[in-house]
Amino acid sequence: MAPSCTGPRPVNTPLSISARELNDRLRQGETIQLVDVREDRELSWARLPHPVLHLPLSRSAEWVAQLDQQLERDRPIAVLCHAGVRSWQFACWLVEQHGYEQVWNLQGGIDAWSVEVDPGVPRY
């Protein structure tokens, strides 16, 4: 199991956050940067009801050079995909290769959000 947002974290590893905890933090007004690494097609099927920075992994060559201008290092970043695998890889990359410190992976991705938080978000 991956480390949680409230537990200890191994060095150079992102944290995992549940859909419920992320929703609670957003509802409490925390300024969390949401990054969605899914493809355009997936975003058209289901999306969070919050503003997200869309960085599809398949098109990383288009956005990687501007990454530091798009993400603030002093605010937490929550990364999501469909089920949490691609977002975990991206979160690890942010921490290990780019030195971001407050990086969370949405456990279970948008599918978990649909199940745990908002059944109005379609599952696919």
Language-model regions, residue ranges each:
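Rhodanese-like catalytic fold shared by cysteine-dependent sulfurtransferases
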Residues: A2-Q33, D40-P76, V85-Y124
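Short, surface-exposed ligand- or partner-binding patches at beta-edge/loop junctions that are enriched
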Residues: L80
